[in-house]
Amino acid sequence: MGLKIIYGRAGTGKSTFCINQIKKKINNSPTNKLILLVPEQFTFQTENKVLNAIGERYVLNAEVLSFKRLAHNVFNECGGATRTIMGDAGKSMLIFKVLEDLGDNMTVFKNASRQKGFIDIASKTITEFKKYNVNNEVLDLTINEIEDENLKMKMEELKDVFNEFNSRLHEGYVDEEDQLLLLNEKLDGCSLYDGAEIWIDEFSSFTPNQLSVIGKLLKKAKSVNITLSIDEVNSPKVESDLFVATKNTEKRLMNLIQEEGIAFNGYINLNEDIPYRFKENKELAHIERQLYAYPFKQYRGENNSLRLYRANNNYDEIEFVAKDILRLVREKQYRFKDISVICREVDNYEKVISAIFAEYEIPYYIDKKIDIASNPLIVFINSAVDIISKNWTYESMFKYLKTGLIKEFRGIEGAELIDELENYVLAYGIKGKKWMEEWVNYSSSILKEEEISEENKQRLERLNDIRETIVTPLDEFNKECKGKKTLKEFAIILYEFLDSKLNIMDTIDKYVEYFKENDMAIEAKEYSEVRDIFIDVLEQAVDVLGNEVMDLDEFMKVLNIGLSQYEMGLIPVALDQVNIGDITRIKSRGTKALYIIGVNDGVLPSASKEEGILSDNDREILLEKGISLASDTRTKIFEEQFLVYTAFTIAEEYLVVTYPLADFEGKSQRPSIIVHRLKKILPNVKEESEGFKLVNDKYDKISAKIPTLNELMIAIRKNYDGAEIDDYWKYVYDWYLREPKWKERIEYVRKGLEYTNLENNISKEKAKKLYEDNKNKISLSVSRLERYAQCPFAYYIQYGLKAKDRKIYEFTAPDLGSFMHEILDEFTNEIKEKDLKWSDLSKENCKNIINSLVDNQVKNNKSSILNSSKRYSYFTDRFKRILTKSVMVISEQMKRSDFEIYKNELAFGFSKDVNSIKLDLPSGESFYLNGRIDRIDKLNLDGETYLRIIDYKTGSKKFDLNKFYNGLQMQLLVYLDALINNSENIVENQAMPGAILYFRIDDPILKSKGDLTEEEIKSEILKELKLEGLLLDDVKVVKAMDNTLEPGTHSLIIPANMKKAGDLGKNKALITMEQFELLRKYVNEKMVEICQNMIEGKIDIEPCKENKNIVCDYCNYSHICQFDSSLEDNRYKVIPKKKDEDIWKSINEKVGGEVNGD
């Protein structure tokens, strides 16, 4: 009976020493038990190491145990397993319920207890109390002595939570920490390990409970041998000492044996000048000795074992690591299993490592736990509950359907059904109660109902069948979950919904079978394990809280808290693979080469300063009162230092340290202090980078097949552009050509060099077929011509190939425009029927008529989007206000004008008022333009008839002569020309142009420094909604448009002003009759030019760019053309900024002679 301490620095062979001792004992055929006790996470690795060292004989004579396994053995042999051990899930669910019940009585933690993550913090605190033997009596005594009121209140509430938790737990359970307390009790009367020889390895510290167990074992065992990673024993305590944690452990062990009267069998010192691990490697031995030495010594010998790499980013970093691993395997005959990659934040690196290692064909295993929240079963359960608790939202419904767990929606056919369903749901705004109703709408408009075709009726029938399949089980589930029930009742309802109604468990079994048959071990394990976890959590919840009454929301909170405690470990799929993991989880297990990545400031060593519920100051006060708990943040800094030391001493032969200059988001990063330290203790080490690599030969770019192919592409591109490349690339190219698997890819590379996204023109015949209607006529609107002028290719995609965006149930700008135009048209008809004049309308008139028209429009179209929600009801009220304000402004404009409204919504084409505008092309074809003029005003003056066109716009718009010149704003001039040409038929005599104007439909917000009078408000509104466009430069005509315009004033309703002399002020909105003629002639020629290009099949990818305005920014087809201005052949059609006088000159040069009769 006695304690022996085996000590040595990292790499001195402490673990090997223990195994060798066990081997010697086995060779002497022992009759007593031989036990190797290690931390839980290292049991599997240690068993393998012992098996490799000793062979199968070890199984019969020795055991590798953790404290948990030790307890299990004792309870099985000597009793004590009467109460079930509650797992982390049950523990968290119980803590949640305790916090819920105590929450209203809390002060300090009242708000925090409801926050996400607090349960984990509370659970850790409870665990900490138990680990450090803090019980109710200890808490009572300590709280009475605490003077700090805040800490006192905090400890009172923690005590309440702690006691309530234990009270409920111990009704039938114990937790893992209780296990050690129970183990302490049972060991006294248990002879299982009497006379055993025990080795305890890989611990740097022990909790008080673990120390108690060791104390009991010391009394029963023949010998207990404990390894500690320290440089020397019996040394004075120095807080900054690298080995301070293990030296504290040594001191506590010595105190323990003194208190218990146990013999000390001495120390075994494994420290030598060069540790066992580094016998053949002076550089790594120097790092072990000097990394944290003060003062330090420098090693100036040749360096072959350490590399430092400064990466541009994480991708560059991991690619460097991948290339170097392949070099070790190919040139140095390393096995992949001899190599490890470690970092501080493995989650951040997982994706980039997976992608790059796959490219380089490096087998690897990431030693990490994965969250189960994204598994289809967990997603399915949560989305099913979300559907009924969040009123059948689109997001929850399609999460539910896309899990692949409902048999009707599995496979390709199932995915197609979901796509069809999703398209309908998005197009018609299906949510809430609409899922429970038969779907009858198939209108193309979101504002009006339409007659449904037979084809669409059949689609609706099929969609309704699908809807029924989905809704029936969910509706039953919804009804069963209503109101409050016990947790057990909810658990039964949920499980029956999954298993009996939808056969989800059977579906999961089929997936597992499929994965196994297709060598998908990871997926098979995940699906199988998550199903078992779900059932286990459900059972734990029922056991712990089964009789608690709650609603569905609270039940799901409990369930998800339980599920959140589970993570799955990944399975190593091969024996020979690179081991990747967190720096805290990977220990030295025959690691010849080690890559430590992400060695950045604040990352390694970690700068975390999370204190938890109890701050460092709280812990100091509690320590003074006799409660010793886990380390404070200051102590953790030194523990982190020891962790770094341990990591940097894992490698036996080769160490690579890398750090990126930028993180995954592109933010700059600095190297860790460790990098600077390495440079100081090994001054001959050269820091490498993309521009400088020590292992740098011209064949460096030839590695694995995919990366080499990528480099080959770059070389081919350089050669294609005329640059010199190395000769060996020709042989690389030939190799890929000879390999059938790669030949096709090389051909793609070659074609890629010749690739251009420019489209060849289509034939005239094809253009006619694409653009002609069913009457073999090419009919289109002016806005479509403008669209072609913006970008011929976009026009071809939209109107030639008829590409359509996915229809979404939303109120868009075009919908708003249509709605406003229709109401204004109905308003005009209404006042005409009532024999009212615009100039006689009052505010009350306007408001009442508009309200009535809008209400009727919405009421008469039940499927209108404006009936769909309260949000759209608000929009409807807002539209009423805008329209009322607009018609009041129109009324005021008409009061001030001698022009009269002659006609609204005059249609060209559409078999209505006036024939289509016919354009005859030089090539013999004809185009027909259709359109609709919002409003025509007429003035009879001095025997002449003047017309002005008003176009209603829901956004701000002004006439831009430059856009007009380039074919981007032709509409009003086209309408004016057609109106003048047909005026004898329309207004019964030849008319002349008076104006083309835009009217903005709006309810403007006025900005003013002070209060405004009623009259000032009216003037400001008129000014804000002033008509914009072009006017005939004739003082009589302009005065007729605003009869309030006086000398020396500016008009509030049109873009004009009058000088004091009575003539019109200079204004680019004013143009002469001759200029109107020029514009009319030019617009016709421009339209013919555009139509000629269209019929000739020109579909150039040539988007317009005007200053910073680029058509592509608002184009839905840019992903099709893949226009890229950096490509040689991709060019914008730049609209240069010109002065109006220069544009007029250009127009005059083009068509002036024709207007003047030349």
UniProtKB/Swiss-Prot annotation:
GO molecular function, a single term: metal ion binding
A Pfam family recorded for this sequence: PDDEXK_1
Residues annotated as binding [4Fe-4S] cluster: C791, C1112, C1115, C1121
Binding of ATP, residues: G8, R9, A10, G11, T12, G13, K14, S15
UniProt EC number: 3.1.-.-
Keywords: 4Fe-4S, ATP-binding, DNA damage, DNA repair, DNA-binding, Exonuclease, Helicase, Hydrolase, Iron, Iron-sulfur, Metal-binding, Nuclease, Nucleotide-binding
Keyword field contains DNA-binding: yes
Superkingdom per UniProt: Bacteria
Cofactor note (record): Binds 1 [4Fe-4S] cluster.
Cofactors (names): Mg(2+); [4Fe-4S] cluster
Keyword Phosphoprotein belongs to the record: no
Annotated Gene3D superfamilies: 3.90.320.10, 6.10.140.1030, P-loop containing nucleotide triphosphate hydrolases
Function: The heterodimer acts as both an ATP-dependent DNA helicase and an ATP-dependent, dual-direction single-stranded exonuclease. Recognizes the chi site generating a DNA molecule suitable for the initiation of homologous recombination. The AddB subunit has 5' -> 3' nuclease activity but not helicase activity.
Similarity section: Belongs to the helicase family. AddB/RexB type 1 subfamily.
Assembly behavior: Heterodimer of AddA and AddB.
Name of the protein in question: ATP-dependent helicase/deoxyribonuclease subunit B
Organism per entry: Clostridium perfringens (strain SM101 / Type A)
